[in-house]
């Protein structure tokens, strides 16, 4: 069996690999963003502090997958941020090494029950039966399984790792390779990108922001960007 949990085939070549229904839930979608995922982390931190999110689920791909995981954390957000930035990123040049360090930090300090994983929907692009499919996962067995899915959702061959990455024995690639790697096959009313508050400063949480080319310009390079500064800038821009 290639997939686990409840399998729902929807339109747009999307397979939902989930444990729970989302039809009655509000959705926040979070885009890919490369290293600027740290900027989106600042946005998400502000959201958690200032908006009631208990009725929302979080659907993201690539950097958006990691931020969806953060949004599902039950408490102690400040500790989580501190653990992430206790990592020395000075000589870390690739997203793969960043992901490995973040995975280690999270697993060393948290357990599965510290997160509401049933609220997390991670978009991936899977190669199966000689074609690409968008696969959305929600049926995580534990925290490590969810993190491994985040890594798969962020995998770009030869950029974030080796040529292939397998998640649940399937060749898995960056969810950003899919047009709409989100739970209902479209952007939600709240769609977070690295340029979200730049475009919506006067209209918070209203309607989707269109993807901006700047969302992807720092995908492969962080040499001009301090990750902590990007996080702080995202938090400040959200105010």
Predicted regions and their residues:
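Patatin-like phospholipase
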Residues: 1-59, 69-239
């Amino acid at each position: 069996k290639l997939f686990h949990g409840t399998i729902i085939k929807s339109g747009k070549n999307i397979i939902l690999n989930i444990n729970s229904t989302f039809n009655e839930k509000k959705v926040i979608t979070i885009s890919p963003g490369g290293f600027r995922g740290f900027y989106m982390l600042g946005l998400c931190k502000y959201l958690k502090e200032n908006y009631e999110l208990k009725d929302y689920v979080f659907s993201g791909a690539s950097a958006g997958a990691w931020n969806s995981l953060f949004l599902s954390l039950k408490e102690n957000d400040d500790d989580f941020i501190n653990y992430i930035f206790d990592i020395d990123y000075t000589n870390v040049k690739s997203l793969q090494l960043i992901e490995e360090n973040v995975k280690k930090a999270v697993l060393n300090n948290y357990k599965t029950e510290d997160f509401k994983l049933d609220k997390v929907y991670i978009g991936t692009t899977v190669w199966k039966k000689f074609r690409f499919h968008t696969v959305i996962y929600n049926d995580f067995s534990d925290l490590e399984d969810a993190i491994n899915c985040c890594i798969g959702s962020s995998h770009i061959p030869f950029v974030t790792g080796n040529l292939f990455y397998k998640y649940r024995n399937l060749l898995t690639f960056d969810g950003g390779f899919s047009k709409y790697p989100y739970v209902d096959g479209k952007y939600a009313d709240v769609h977070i990108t690295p340029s979200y508050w730049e475009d919506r400063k006067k209209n918070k949480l209203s309607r989707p922001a269109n993807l901006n080319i700047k969302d992807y310009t720092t995908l492969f390079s962080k040499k001009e960007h301090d990750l902590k500064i990007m996080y702080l800038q995202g938090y400040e821009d959200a105010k």
